[in-house]
Each structure stands twice: as C-alpha cells, then as structure tokens.
Amino acid sequence: MDTQPAPVPHVLPQDVYEFPDDQESLGRLRVSEMPAELNGGGGGGSAAAFAMELPEQSNKKRKRCGVCVPCLRKEPCGACYNCVNRSTSHQICKMRKCEQLKKKRVVPMKGVENCSESILVDGPKTDQMEAGPVNHVQEGRLKQECDSTLPSKGCEDLANQLLMEANSWLSNTAAPQDPCNKLNWDKPTIPNHAANNNSNLEDAKNLVAFSAVAEAMSTYGMPASGTPSSVSLQLYEKFNYETNRDNSGHLEGNAPSCPEDLNTLKAALALAKHGVKPPNCNCDGPECPDYLEWLENKIKSTVKGSQESPFPNLGQVSKELVQKQYPKEQVLNLENKNSTCPSGNLPFSQNALSLAKEKNISLQTAIAIEALTQLSSALPQTNNECPNAPSQPLINPHDQLTHFPSAKGNQLPMLPVARNELFQNQQSQLYTGKNALPVPQSPRQTSWEQNKKSSYQEGQYIPENLSHSSSVLPSDASTPQKPEFLQQWVQNADLLKSPSDPMTGLKQLLGNTDEYIKSVFKGPEALPNKKNVKPKHTIKSIKKESTEFLKMSPDQQLSQLLQTNEFHRNTQAALQQHLHHKRNLFVDPNAMEACTQEQQNWWVPSSQQAPVSKTTEKPVKERKKRRQSPSQKQVEPKPKPQRKQVQIKKPKVKEGSAVFMPVSQISLDTFRRVEKEENQGKEMDAENSLPNNVQTELLESQSLQLTGSQANPDDRKTVNTQEMCNENQSNIGKANNFALCVNRANSFVAKDQCPTPSTHDTSSSSGQGDSANQHTNVSDVPGQNDLSCLDDKLEDLIRQFEAEFGEDFSLPGSAVPSQNGEGPPKQTPSGDPQFKLPFPSQLLPPENSTKPATHSNPALSNNPVSREVSNNLDSLFSSKSPKQIKIESSGAITVVSTTCFYSEENQHLDGTPTKSDLPFNPTLSGFLDSPLKYLTSPTKSLIDTPAKKAQAEFPTCDCVEQINEKDEGPYYTHLGSGPTVASIRELMEERFGQKGDAIRIEKVIYTGKEGKSSRGCPIAKWVIRRQSEDEKLMCLVRQRAGHHCENAVIIILIMAWEGIPRSLGDSLYNDITETITKYGNPTSRRCGLNDDRTCACQGKDPNTCGASFSFGCSWSMYFNGCKYARSKTPRKFRLIGENPKEEDGLKDNFQNLATKVAPVYKMLAPQAYQNQVNNEDIAIDCRLGLKEGRPFSGVTACMDFCAHAHKDQHNLYNGCTVVCTLTKEDNRMIGRVAEDEQLHVLPLYKVSTTDEFGSEEGQLEKIKKGGIHVLSSFPREVRKLSEPAKSCRQRQLEAKKAAAEKKKLQKEKLVSPDKTKQEPSDKKTCQQNPGVPQQQTKPCIKVEPSNHYNNFKYNGNGVVESYSVLGSCRPSDPYSMNSVYSYHSFYAQPNLPSVNGFHSKYALPPFGFYGFPNNPVVPNQFMNYGTSDARNSGWMNNCFEKKPELQSLADGMNQSYGSELSEQSFRRSSEVPHHYSLQNPSSQKSVNVPHRTTPAPVETTPYSNLPCYNKVIKKEPGSDPLVDSFQRANSVHSHSPGVNHSLQASDLPISYKANGALSSSGRTNAESPCSMFMPNDKNGLEKKDYFGVHSNAPGLKDKQWPPYGTDVSVRQHDSLDSQSPGKVWSSCKLSDSSAALPSSASTQDKNWNGRQVSLNQGMKESALFQEKLWNSVAASDRCSATPSDRSSITPCSELQDKNWGSFPNPTVNSLKTDSSQNHWDPYSLDDNMDDGQSKSVKEEDDEEIWSDSEHNFLDENIGGVAVAPGHGSILIECARRELHATTPLKKPNRCHPTRISLVFYQHKNLNQPNHGLALWEAKMKQLAERARAREEEAAKLGIKQEVKSLGKKRKWGGAATTETPPVEKKDYTPTRQAATILTDSATTSFSYAYTKVTGPYSRFI
C-alpha cells in the first residue's frame, strides 16, 4: 500500500465550531486525516515525523478560504446542531463551515519509519483494500508491532488510511478507502492480507485503540500534567514543523528538537487534552486538535520505536509471530498498521466526529462510542484473521482497547468501517469489539464517528493519530499495547500453530482471554473462555483500569494503557481467541467448526463479544433492536462523560434518530458468520434475506433509515450505522427499544443467515470490518483495561437488560452453539455467569456475526443489552436458550421473535420480564396483526407520536429555560430569523436582491392583548402603509423577549408591495368581481362573525354584503380528506349552476396567479415554500399552479369580507398563507388613503417605539410621513344583528326538528279527522264557492299537483340552492332538506306546516280543501292561471290542461266568493299565493295570480285562498318569512285594513319569530291568508296594494322591520283582519303574508321584498322567475303577495336570479344583486325571512349605535397593528400561528368590492394522490362491509334494517321523508281530491302528506 500524500485539506479548524468539542479527538482526527506519511503511518519515526509536521500545522491556525459558499454565507442556518445549541456548542454553523477547513489538513509524512509504505491520504488504494481479507487479529499484532518497531508500509498505509478516514469523517464523506476495506472485509479470511488487512485492521484497530484511549482519557479524566512547559513548547514547535511539513507533503526538514520521552509526550498530551495549548497555538477551542493528534502519533511513534526493535513493541505477539515463522515483514507490517491505526486515525472517524458534533459530546466520547460501534459491528473474522489474529491482538492491545470501548460505546459507529472489511474481519472485530468495549476512548471515537455519520472503513476511520496513539498505548503498560498484548497474544498464537491459523492462536490466547471476557461480559459465553491466557485477572484489572482509566486524564490514560499492556495482551489473547472463534464462525463451515472450538476459548476471554459472535449472530439483531439505542446510550454515557454528552444529545437523537441501530450496524454479518461456522448455507440464505428484512423491520419498528443500509449494505449500513450509533448513543433510552430490534435482528439473522454477505458489505461500508479487526486486536489488548471498563459498562447494560429481560435471562453458552453450531459459544454463555443476559456475550459476536445488530447497537455489546442480545443470539442459535429468536419474513417485513420462554437454559424468568411488553410468543402474524406489541414502550412512544415530527421542529436555545409562547409570542422560523434586526435586513436583502430603502423593517412587540371593538370585531390602532414607490418590501419582525440567540428576532410578516404586475391585478379584479358576483357560491366561515355571532360586519344587505368564496381543494370532514375524493372530474373552481365558461375563466385566472405567486413566495420565504412543496409530487392533484413548484392547495377569494380574529389552524404547520390583494380603483394610489379601505390586522401586536435601527426619531419621522398611521378612538358605526346568527349545526338541528314536528303533525292529521275537520270548517269560510272549483281543482290537482308541486318544490329548493350554503341541493322535503339550510329554514320552520295548514289548526285554509271545495288549493294554482294570463303563464304553463279548468273554477269561485270573507280570504290567500309564487317557479305564475287577483279579487279570493295555501306551501319552502314579509309588505301597502289587520293581528306575533320562524299560530296565519284574500274585492284591491309592494315598497323598506313590530304593518294587518271575516284564516294567512310582506317590503334589503315589488312585473316574466325559481321563490311569494306590484315582479324575476331577494328597492337591478346576496345569508338569517326582516328592523335601530372602542386606546398594550395592503401586493404570514383579522368596511359591496383578498394556502393533510380517492374507497369498502355485516345480523335476528334506515333518512331526507309519509300521501292524492271535495279529514290527511312533501302537493294545490 503505497503512501499517496494526497493533499489533505487543513484539518485544523478555522473555527472551533467546525470540530467536536473534544479537541484532542479533533487533533487526532486531523492526524488521521493526514496521509499516513503525515500521521507517521508506520513506526515511531513516522509518528515523530508526523508529529513534527503536525506542530507546524497546529502552530498556524488555518484560515477560512473566504471564497467557498459556506464562507460567503453570512447568516447561520439556525437549524443545525451547532446553531441550535449555540450556548453549549462552540462550533460554527455547519452551513458556514469552510469547505477547506472541513477537509483535513494535508500533512505529508515522509518519514514513516515503522511504516515505510505510506497509505493513501484518502485511504488505502483499492488494491490495498482488496488485496485480501483482513485478519484483524494479525492486523492487531502487526499494528502493535508496527507501533513498537515495524516501519512497514502497512503502518504507513494505515496512517494514510487513518488520515483518509479522518478526512472523510471531517468531510462527512466516506474515504475512498471504504470500498476497498469493504471488499477486504467482505472476503472471509485471507492469510495473506497483510497490507489490506493491515489497513483495514489498522483502521478498525486504530479506531478501537483511539476510542479506547479517548474513552479512557475522557472517562478517567486524567488531570492535565500541568501548564505548558518548555518541553511542551518544544513539542509544539516540533509539531508545527511537522505540520507544516505535512502540509507541504514532505516530512523532510529539520524538526526542532524536542523530548521524545514517552512520559513527556504523555504529559504533554494530557495537558493538551485538558486545554493546555502551547503558547503559540492559534486554534479555536480549548484544545489544539492537531497538536493532540501529533502528540498521540508521537507517542505511538515512540512506542513503535521502542517496539521497532526486532520486536520490542511488536511485543510478544510480533516476536512470537516471527518466532512462530510468521513472516517478519508481514508481522511488522501488521504491527505497523495496527499501531498506526490506533495511534492517529482511530479517534477521528467521521462517525465519531459527526457524533461529537451532533450530540454535542466530547470528541473523546464520540470516538469511544464510534470505536465501540465499530467493534460491535466489526466482528473478528475467524478465517481471515486466524493466521494473524494472535499477532494483531497483541500488536494492538491499545488499539483493541480503544476499539473495544468504541465498539462498546458505539457499536453503530463500528459500521463506519467498511462492512466488507467488517465482515471479513468480523470475528476479529468481534474480538475487538469485546476487547475494545472496556476502553473508554473508543466510545469517544464511536461518538465522533457517529456524528460524522459517514461510512468509513475502520482504517479510513482511524486517524493516523490513532496509529501513533496506538504506538503510544502499547508503550504504556497500563494501556495494553499492541506489542505486549501481541506478544501475549503471540504466545497464544504459538498455540495457534501458524499465522495462517489464527483460530489456533486465538484458542490458545483464549485460555486467558476467555476469563477476561467473562468478567467483562458476565455472560455464560464468557465462562468457557475463562480458561484463556489471563482473562479473569486481566479483566478484573481491566475493569479497575477502565474505571480508573476513565477517571484519568487522556495522557494518564494513555500511559496507563501502555502500562497495562500486559493486561491488554492477555485480554487481546482472549479477545483474539474470541475473534478467532468469531472468524471461524464467519469462516467456511469447516473453518467455523474449527474456529468454534478455538473461538469458544478465545471467545470466552472476549466473551463480551466473542460469545456474542455465535450467539449474537441471531440474537444480536434482536439486541440491536432492543438495546442498540438504549444500550449504547446507557453504556456510553455511563462509562464516560462522553456518554453523558451523548445522553444530552439523546433527546435530539430520539427525535431524529431511529431507535434501532443503523442498518449497517444492524447488519447480520456477525450473525451470519456465526451461522457460517454452524451453517454457512443457512447464513447465506439468512444474509440475503435477513439484513434487508431486519433492516426493514428495524425501519418499520424504529423508523430508522435502515432502508438505505439495506439497499447499500456497505455504504448505507455504514452511514446508517454511524447515524444509528449516534442516535442510539444519544438515545440510550432507546437502547432497550433498539435492543428489542436487535433481538429481532438477531432473530432475523438466526432465521435467515443469508444476510451475512450483505451484512459483510454493510460492515465493510461502515468501515467496521477493519475496525472490527483492529478492535479484535485492540479488544484483546483492552481485554484488561477495556474489559474492566466494559465490564462496568456491560454490567450497567446487563442490569438494564436484566431489568428489561431479567437478570437471569441469559442464554446458556450451549444455546448459542446449538444455533451457531459452536459448542464454545454455548458454553461461554452458560459457563460465564456474567452472561446472564441473553445479549451480553452475544452482543459483540452479533456485531461480528450480525453486523446489523452489532452496528445497530455497538453499545449493546458492551451493555447488558448487548449481553442480552448475545444471549438472545444464543437462544437463536440454540433452541435451549430461553430467548430463542424466530425469524419470520413477509415481503419487506421481517419479524424476529424471541421466544421468551422461561426455559431452563434461559433459566430466568427475569429475562422474559424485559420482553414483558412484547408478545410472549411473537410471530409474524402477530406482528402484522399488532406491530406495536413487538415494540418497547419508548419505541411505541416514538411511533405513537409521529405528529410531533409533523410539527415544526424549530431551533431551540438556552436563552430561557422554557419557551413560553404566551409571553413571547408564537415561535417559528420558517419565514426567517436572525440574532438581530440588522441580520434580518441582511437576510431579506439577500433574498430580495435589493438594498436600502427598497426594504423596510418594522419592529412590532407582542403583547398578547387582543385589540377588538366592544362587539368583538377587528379594529386597528396603528396602520403601516407604504411610504413611497421606492419601498418594495416590508417586513414585520418581532424581538423574542429574553432571547439573545441566533433566532432572537423572527419575521412574522412579509409584504411585497408589488407582488404582481399592475395590469394583471387590474384584469383579475374585473374578472373575479364579475364572475364571482354572478356565479359565486359563498362559503360560510366562522370568522365572519364575532364570538357572540351578533355582528353585521359583512353588511346587512345580503345582496352586497361581504362574502368569502373557496376554490381549489379543501378538507372534507365527511371524506376525511380532500372534498374531491369521489370526484372523477373535480371542479376546483365550481360556480353555481352549469357555467363551464365562467368556471374555465376563473380557473385560468387562479391557476395563472398561483403560478406567478409561487416564485415570489419562494424568493421571500424559501424555507416555508420548501415545506409546502415537499409533498407536491405525491399530492399534485391537490395543488394549484401550472408549473413545478406548487405550494398551494386552495385559494379563498374574500370580497369585502371582514374576517374576525382567528388562526388558520388547519393550514400546513410549517407553511404560510400568501395573500394577493386587489383593491378598488380609488384605492390604488400610493400615499393616498382611500375613503373606505380594509386593513390586515395583527390584533396581538403593537408598534415599537423605535425603528429598526433603534431610533425613536426615525419612528416619529415615519409617522409624520405617513408610513405609520397612528389611529385614535373615534366613533364607529356598529352593525348588529337582532339575534345571534345560527351556526350551521344549529340550523340543521332546527330544520330537522321542524321537519320532524311537521311530519308528526302530518301523521296526526292523517290519523285524526278532527283537525282536518277543523281545517275544513275554516276553509269553508274561505270556500264559499267550493263547488265547481273543487271539482275542477281535483282533476287539475291530480294532473298538475306533481308538476306544480315539483315546480314549487324546485322553487323552494332553488331558493335553497341560491344560497351558497345549500349549493345545488334541492331537497324534495322542505321540512327536511330545506330546513337543514340556514337560508331555507323557512321550509323547515313550523310555519310551513301551518302554511300548509295541516300542521296548524288552520291547515285547511291553505289548501282550502275543507272550507272551500279545493278552491283555495286549486285557486292558488289556477288563480294564477285564471286571474291573469300572466299568472297562467306561470302556474298554468306548469299546470296541465286541467289547470285552465281550475282557473275557470277559481274565477267562478272568486266571483262566488264575493263576500268580504271570501274576498278577504282570497286576498289573503292571493297575497300568500303571490308570495309563494315568487318563491316558486309557480310563484311567478302566482305573481300573475295576484295580478289576476287585483282585477278579480272575488275570483281570486277563493283561488287566492288556494294560492295563499300555495303561498303557504311555498311559504314553507320560502319559509314563512317570505310570506310574512310579503304579507307584511302587503299589510303595509295594502289599503284594505281588514286584510292587513287580520294579517297583522295574527301574523305579526305568529309570523315573526326569531329567524323568521313562524309559530304554529303563524302557520295558522299563513293559512288565514286564504281568508285574507277571501274577503271582498276591495280587500283584494287593498290586497293588490298590499301586494303592490313596489308602490309601498319604500315604506315597507323603511318599515320593513316594523311589520315585525311596526305600527304600520300592524295597522294594515289590523285593517286586513277587520275586513277579513275569518280572522283565523285571514289572520293566519293574511297576517303571515302581511307580516311577510311588510318585513319583506321594508326588508327589501332582503330579496323578498324586492321580489314582492317586482312580483307584479315579474309575473309577466315568470319564465325568468322559473329559471331562477328557487331564487325568486321567496321573493316571488312576496311579490305574489302584492298582486298590484307586477311592475316590481320584473325586478323580482331578477331577484330570482339571486335569491338574495331583500333589497332596499324592489328595482330589478337591486333585486338581482340583492337576490343573490339574499340567497346567501352570511349570518344564516335566511333561516327565516322574518329574521332578516326583523333583523333589518333592528338594523335600523342598530344603525344608530356607535362605538369608539375607547378601551382599546386607553391601554397601550392592547394590540392592533394593521397593514394596509395595496393593489397587487402579496402578503406572506404564518396564519396558522399568528392571530390575524381584517377590518370591516363601512359600506361593503361585493359587487364592487373595496378589496379582494386572494388567500393561497395549503391544508396540512392534503397529501394524498388523486385527492385521496384510494383512502376514500377503502373507507367506503369498510363501511360497506360493516353494513353488509349489519344486514346479515339483522337478517339473522329478523330485523328490518331498511326500515330503520328509512326511518332515519326518510325522516330527515327530503326524498326519504317524502317517500315514507308522502308515499302514503301520494296514495292519498286521489283522496286529496276527494277529500278536497268531500271531507276535511280525508283532504287533510292527503293534503298534509303533500304538505310534508312540500313540492308536489303544494304545487298542485
């Protein structure tokens, strides 16, 4: 492996923020980044050289390049970890980190004494990586040897690799070395893998070693040796020299002399680590990373130098290897590599760096975590490393320690090592992981690696510093140096008969190492290994050392590590045996079998990992799942402060990190290898399926990014492993969850061992292979230190697992072997009491055997969770184990079920308790049925609260203990934020592209006190206006109280004054106004009213009142999705009726506007824009716009609509609303305030007293110039409703209730002839001439009733439809459907029944069947025909030929009914009919009837009575208010006092109710109108006048409300009543009609009066009325009420166009516009015209009410900042979070709006393709199935469900209702005829039925 001094970017951080908190780690990292040459990639000489160069680099702080994008970035992103944790993090924003600084400094290290061959800066060459499988054990030996003596190129290569890794870590990119390492790791074992394995092993070992050192140093917290001394200065000078030389790429040069004594170097290192930097150090931060790295490398070099003696530091292993006929060169290379890797690169894997940065933990901790991860993930490969295994462990005792802790801390980070390499070296890695676990540094490294989250091979990952450090470590007895340990290991290796047979050496070594492993893991697996070299003693010492070591300073730790070389050697021996065993597991079945024996022994020593290897392969995955996060977290934090740091980051990790280990870590390679030993075939199968399955499962269960790792095991797993590690470490609490996942993974592995290849790939990609190999060696060395540390950690983890799974829950060692086919693993778990938990020993092996599990939770291997995982793996491998893992896969779901049997072998019920939450006997089916049962509570909590992810995760800070939005206001940053107002200006200038006056910043202060009028309506206290044309952009910013962080100032509103071109705005204003005014369907919005629902801010005139129209996709609560879920051809811009052209035009306008607004939105608020387009591809159907980049799903057009203070709660949580404003022509000039304008208000804010620059004078200047308009209390007109507007729900309930009552009454009438008789008696009064008309009427009724009724019905529905609320619904039953609508409450009102007369005691008069022989009924229709041709045209056109007969009958009847009573009744009825005819298409005809009535009042009278009934019927649909309004108008206008009196007397109280609902008496009155018209002609004439609302309309207008309580109407009613003999009838109907008329007349604001006025004229234009019959129904009824007002009928017809009927004037124009407005009652007043009328009456009173809202101005803290949007402006705000409103206009007129607000928004849930049709269909299918089931059940029970459904639906449904009673009533239709002629009862029942039906019967009548 030739050293390629590729230029490495300067590693030294320009900004402290660029590097992890652990400067030492950084330094090491940088060293690792440097080429092997720089790192001293070989012997101590190289290290020294590198040290020389490093000092040079560190002396000179690298500067930011100033040209890259990050350097040019001025503002911190505010979202990265460094920004979020600004108070604790000393690193610069990641987005601002210089690209050059990210790159590691190129430190060419020429003089690599030990490793003459340099390694590529970016890692070993592909050929190097691919040269062969890496024998981690051998590599470990070689590294140790290399540290001590070998100047082999392997060391250089390792150094280079380390540098590459460091570089890659720093750059967050995998070093080129990864693929190679992966390849090497992928290969099981190749004896001749010196170079490649060296690099890989070196990487892994370096990582482990460094992690161990880092962990030890961080954990022990060695006190700094002291302040920098002259020696330190000398060292620093030399470091600078070497650094500079490294940068230059040459090691040449005269390095300043410096003491190279190991103790001196250690002391300097300790000092440097504790913040003592040389005087000339210019590095940011407490430590000089480069210097630390250099020192470590120097130490390593020194150690290596001492070892370089033939085998001084190679130690026993190297010597033994050489003595044992190992090629010296190979041994040296291996040792060099080992030493190199641990010394420099190990600490600075990208994963560790990333972890350190992201988790805000020290680099040491991160490295330790990473090392643990890699160790756990990189299991020793028995075959690959068997020959060299003994050497490597011995070689890299320190490295192993480092790696081992790192594995312990970060099993996930282990993945960074190339997965291939890991797989190749899994066994070694496994050993390493176990051995490394104790080492505290490794966790640091792991953490760091995790932070980097980039897959790197261990070699790449390990900085050159690690190699030096490894050399240093070996030199120190305390730290099991590779040489010593290697020697010991080599002694064991002697047992290993040849380097090619590392298994033998491992077995020999395992004699002692087993004991160590046991002690560390406390698992049964470790017990078998107790036999090994010095395991127990070493372990104990290691524990102690680990504890002490953690307490020691880094230097002390290093020294101690060096001192404990013996222990480490023993440990290495054990670990090597363990690794060897694992290698066997991973080796071919034969090899695995051979290794199994050996591995059992060495596995025992490395039982922490070794037993895990076999047992872990399957169980490891489970462990990973359960414990990865928890175990790692717990273990890492517990062992050392780094872990604590990880814990600190846990919450974040929990948020963003998956509970499970990274996929790479979760890889099943270890498992697979174990199975390979047992069953390679099985492993192959499992590997193929398990890794993906496991990953999938993990992804599913933990929502981890396992998919990536699955897809690319090498790269993704590595990355994922690191990420997972970070997440897991940060989320130790999740470790248990992850452990569960790990168990599952283990189950997968056990079940499917095919995943091994992928697992290997994963490990390779993660770079864990090398690390694993190195870790294996390291773990052997750390067996003592690391094992001791790990032992403590593992004990903690074990306790955790015991708490979860039970202390005794452990798999017997044999259990694992049974699965693995390895007796030793079984023995180990069973034999080693330490492995009580199923995972302890298995954890590490699973890491090796099951990379996913291991990678997922390296900590698990170290933790009880790891042990438990190991035990689980054992269970997996052996049915004996109480927790056997069962792997079931179905598609992408793989369920690893651990049979939590309290089996004898598993021994302890305690093991099960851990899984108490899990199903006792998990299965795939069980998982599919209830996946949550398989998750631990923390995992469930994560899954159960995904909504939080949906919530904006805004940056946090430490400015305040807890953000209290009530005090500081809503907190969000997606509009923009910064530390100061000036930063906001810079930000907006950058976005907008202009500076200076073009951008205006206004500060506002959040008060939390809402400014509103006394009525609760919006007001403004300050108005921000555009100052000049130069001002292009205005931003409102809020200073967050108590904050001084990066997000102390946030943007709350952005106003682009020229958002769209002026020409576009003008055309849009015209087009939208014309289209929407005519065809728009207003939307009822809660914000249109105040809290009391009593304000009339939208205006009192329904024809001009402000309205809101919705277009595009919106949420439907019915569909629980987009309202177009069922629409095959959605009409997003639907208008009333069929108007495709208008809809297309509107669509084009809005789509084009959305397309043009989106870029502006993107420019001004890029983050919010991006949030809204994230799901564009998925839900493109629910998006507006013609081009890519569609942030909006819907648009609301508000035309003079006053929106009361509200928040758009259903908008996208992290999105904004974009409001495009179009203003009237007189409000388009800058600097001129229009007479009437609408403002956008923020009621909770007040204006700051200073401008953006903090100047009060500047603010005053703005006020003077008009930029800020300060308002004061001034009188404002208060528009108030007479009664609170009903909500849609209330209206529906009332409508249903009324319908139910009517139906009930109908039924009663049908059943009881008494009522019918009463009605007939009354009718008799009206029916003075019943004979002919009745007969004729019968046939006519028979024929026409359905048609006419349908017409009427349509009319009533039409009225309903006219209201936007109603839409196109035209319920047949006014009681049911119409009543549901607020505007059609008339139909639902009791008045309707009373109008029909059947419900009320006066039911007869309306139909006139009883009193008058069908005359009243027929006359209504036929009178329309007979009275006047025009009327005939109306009603007769609809009527059959018999209608003319009816007309003639009516005429005759009218004549016959010459009596006053008949006339009065006729008049009343005619009035009523007129009203009804206005309401109905027939009402137009009935309008004609009134006209006819005028000429022939007598004739009309009988028919008018009928019409009155019709009117009443229509009145039902139109709701009595119409009739009442017309009648009232008539009463006002009518000259016949009798009629008016009768109407008034009974009608006023009756007809006028809240919301115009008529009382039953009102109903009676409605009926009485027949009598009203029945009186004599004069009454009829008066009635004409009465109907002649047009003539009297003005008066009615003025007194429109009075009929509600006005004397005029009363008088008129009184006169009518006096004239009408049948007061009951006349009073009922006449009063209704009179009441209706007066109100309508006076309420010409309501379309009804206008229609009355125009009704007479409209009669002629009945066709028009019919076209919009429903609109004109109410009006036409009113109009019909005034027969004399035919001229007004024409307007009425227009009114029909817009059912807004109530107009100030009956004029056609006003009627037309008003009618539409009338149609739509923004206040739901349409429920009854009476309400509208009464409202208008009160409005007059209210108009006199004024308010100055003085209380708002007395308190300066009451908010009310308003912005005056200009024509074409675009306003952007977070409407979901900010309370906002729009002020009411003085004179709203949506026909010519003062302001049109086009509000573009995106609903939070409109993210389904095809409008969510699939979801809807699924829902419907489910409902259908349920219905079918209910039907089946009902059939079984003999219940008729249909009846029930009919009962409900028909009860409320118009059609259904009609069907049930109406069907019967329809049957009675003939009866009705007969009843009409013959009996009241029969007639009543029939007519009532039709009455209920409302349509057909009424029409015919």
Curated annotation (Swiss-Prot):
InterPro entries tied to this protein: 2OGFeDO_JBP1/TET_oxygenase_dom, TET1/2/3, TET_oxygenase, Znf_CXXC
Keywords: Chromatin regulator, Chromosome, Developmental protein, Dioxygenase, DNA-binding, Iron, Metal-binding, Nucleus, Oxidoreductase, Zinc, Zinc-finger
Record GO biological process: chromosomal 5-methylcytosine DNA demethylation, oxidation pathway; eye development; positive regulation of gene expression via chromosomal CpG island demethylation
Binding site for Zn(2+) 1: C65, C68, C71, C98, H1043
A single GO cellular-component term on record: chromosome
Cofactors (names): Fe(2+); Zn(2+)
Protein localization: Nucleus; Chromosome
Polar residues bias: start-end ranges: 442-455, 602-614, 847-867, 1326-1338, 1477-1487, 1680-1693, 1702-1719
Region (Disordered): 434-455, 602-658, 751-787, 808-867, 1282-1338, 1457-1501, 1591-1624, 1680-1745
Biased amino acid composition, Basic residues: 640-652
UniProt function note: Dioxygenase that catalyzes the conversion of the modified genomic base 5-methylcytosine (5mC) into 5-hydroxymethylcytosine (5hmC) and plays a key role in epigenetic chromatin reprogramming during embryonic development. Conversion of 5mC into 5hmC probably constitutes the first step in cytosine demethylation. Selectively binds to the promoter region of target genes and contributes to regulate the expression of numerous developmental genes, including pax6, rax, sox9 and six3. May also contribute to the regulation of target genes in ways that do not require its enzyme activity.
Domain notes: Binds target DNA that contains at least one unmethylated cytosine via the CXXC-type zinc-finger domain.
Protein name (database record): Methylcytosine dioxygenase tet3
Organism: Xenopus tropicalis (Western clawed frog)
Gene responsible for this protein: tet3
